[in-house]
Structures are given as structure tokens and as C-alpha cells.
């Protein structure tokens, strides 16, 4: 993992509260990617210049080299890949908690953020914590992240029903393109599994009174996975109000902004490998 401290001279507190540390999980379809990709590094500088610490982690790529499988086979492989990534995220989190004094990190102020596969990992990790599943048992009892920021993420559930059974999720900010053809904006059901993106999750969060912000980018696609640098104002508002001040400010916005990046990605579904 790489650890980036707030820039010298930056403002690291607001009203006596220390700004959280952002725990970043990179994207790449569970096939590729690394913690030092250029888009993320630019965003890390934005955050550290503004007084936030950043930790960027690695994780096992559970779909690396996978080709020529059926849809039924693939959903099982996808579940395994997500589980591996979540396990590694929890391992990194446990390390940060154990070494908090020497690293200068406050475990109660860890915000996990991710892009694409990393966003799936972040959302899925919070889902596992809130349901008390065995994979989350490696974390200290009662631990939860201070927040989640998802750039084009989703969760994978069995049985079709999204349930946070043990506890409410932490404050969660989700950004997603309404025309995302790689990670579902709404949901995909296959062989007893449901792959649920922002639209499906926002319905559950709204219906249960959870603390969340949903930003839906009209007619944009998976480009939103790289919107970290372009949405700093939204992130800082979420971090300062929902996370630091613990002010439940729910937002559900449909955004049409042609100035934001749009990269054609074709019609193939990343999670439908032939």
C-alpha cells in the first residue's frame, strides 16, 4: 500500500475535527489496474493539497485471464473476485487499525472510496459489514467505515433482495452514469444473483432512511468511474457535512453536464465475457 500524508501547510481540521483518511481501491474489472494509475494520482494530489490523507491499496485480481466462460460460470467467478478484493480491503483496513499510532491514522475516520471494480469492492465491503458476514469478522467488533464514495460501483447479492440486516450503512456517496454499459446503473439478474448499481441501491437507501447521496449523470456511461478529479466539490461537501459533521444531508440529483468527460466504451458488457 501507499500512504500519502496531507500536504505541508494544508488545512487538516474543520471546527476541531480532523479530516478523514481516504482509503482508495483502484478499478480495472478485477482483471487489471494498479494503485498508482495516473487518474488516481492526480486525485490524490487534490485531496492531500486540501488536507486529507490517502491510502491506496492493492488487491488480488480474481478475473485476470478469465475468458471463454458462460454467463452462469462467470457470475460465480465474479462473486469470487469480489470476495477476494473485499478480503484484501479488510486486510489492509486491519493493518491500518493495528498500526494507527505509528501511521498517524484515526480508524474512526476512514472513508473507503473506489472506481469501477474498486467501487464495487467498497460498496460490497460495507454490505458485508452491515450484514455481519464471516468475511467481515477480521475487523474489530463494532468497526465501520466513516463513509463510502463509489464512482460507478454496484453490489452483488444472492436471492435478489438488498438487505442491510444488522446495521445501517455508513454515509454513502454514489456517482453513476445512466447509460453505463459496463457496471449496471440499475440492476442485472442472473442465475439467482443480482448485480445492483446506484438506481437499485438508492431505492433501498431512500426507503430505509439511510444517509446517502446519489449523483446520476444523464446519458453518461462508465466514464463516471474516472470522475474523481472532476467532482471534488461534491466530495468535499459530502466529507465535511455527512461524514465529519455527521449531518444527514440526503441528495438525489440527475446531472446533465456536457463539459464532463465522455469516452465511448461500446456496447459490450464487461461482466458478460464470452
What are these regions (language model features)?
Residues 16-29:
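Short beta-strand element of the alpha/beta-hydrolase
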Residues 13, 136-208:
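The feature captures the conserved acid-bearing segment of alpha/beta-hydrolase catalytic domains
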Residues 94-168:
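Primarily recognizes the serine-hydrolase "nucleophile elbow" in alpha/beta-hydrolase
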Residues 206-274:
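C-terminal catalytic histidine-bearing segment of alpha/beta-hydrolase fold enzymes
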Residues 1-13, 21:
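A short loop-to-beta-strand scaffold at the N-terminal edge of the catalytic core in hydrolase folds
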Residues 29-32, 54, 95:
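Serine-hydrolase catalytic-loop signature spanning alpha/beta hydrolases and amidase-signature enzymes
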Residues 75-102, 197:
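Alpha/beta-hydrolase active-site loop
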Residues 35-57, 64:
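Short amphipathic alpha-helix adjacent to the substrate-entry channel of hydrolases
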Amino acid at each position: 500500500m501507499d500512504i500519502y500524508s496531507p500536504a505541508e501547510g494544508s488545512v487538516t481540521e474543520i471546527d476541531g475535527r480532523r479530516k478523514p483518511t481516504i482509503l482508495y481501491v483502484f478499478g480495472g474489472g478485477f482483471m487489471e489496474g494498479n494503485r498508482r494509475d495516473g487518474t488516481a494520482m492526480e486525485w490524490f494530489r487534490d485531496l492531500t493539497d486540501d488536507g486529507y490523507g490517502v491510502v491506496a491499496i492493492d488487491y488480488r485480481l480474481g478475473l485476470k485471464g478469465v475468458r471463454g466462460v458462460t454467463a452462469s460460470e462467470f457470475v460465480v467467478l465474479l462473486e469470487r473476485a469480489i470476495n477476494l478484493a473485499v478480503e484484501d480491503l479488510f486486510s489492509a483496513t486491519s493493518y491500518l487499525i493495528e498500526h494507527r499510532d505509528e501511521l498517524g491514522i484515526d480508524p474512526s475516520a476512514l472513508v473507503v472510496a473506489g472506481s469501477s471494480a474498486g467501487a464495487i469492492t467498497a460498496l460490497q465491503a460495507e454490505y458485508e459489514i452491515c450484514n455481519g458476514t464471516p468475511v467481515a469478522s477480521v475487523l474489530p467488533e463494532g468497526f465501520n467505515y466513516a463513509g463510502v464514495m463509489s464512482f460507478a460501483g454496484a453490489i452483488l447479492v444472492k436471492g435478489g433482495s438488498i438487505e442491510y440486516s444488522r446495521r445501517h450503512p455508513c454515509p454513502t456517496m454514489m456517482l453513476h452514469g445512466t447509460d453505463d454499459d459496463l457496471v449496471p446503473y440499475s440492476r442485472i439478474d442472473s442465475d439467482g444473483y443480482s448485480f445492483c448499481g446506484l438506481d437499485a441501491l438508492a431505492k433501498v437507501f431512500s426507503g430505509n432512511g439511510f444517509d446517502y447521496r446519489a449523483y446520476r449523470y444523464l446519458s453518461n456511461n462508465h466514464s463516471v468511474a474516472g470522475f474523481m478529479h472532476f467532482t471534488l466539490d461534491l466530495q468535499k461537501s459530502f466529507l465535511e457535512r455527512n461524514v465529519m459533521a455527521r449531518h444527514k444531508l440526503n441528495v438525489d440529483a440527475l446531472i446533465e453536464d456536457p463539459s464532463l468527460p465522455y469516452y465511448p466504451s461500446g456496447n459490450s458488457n464487461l461482466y458478460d465475457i464470452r
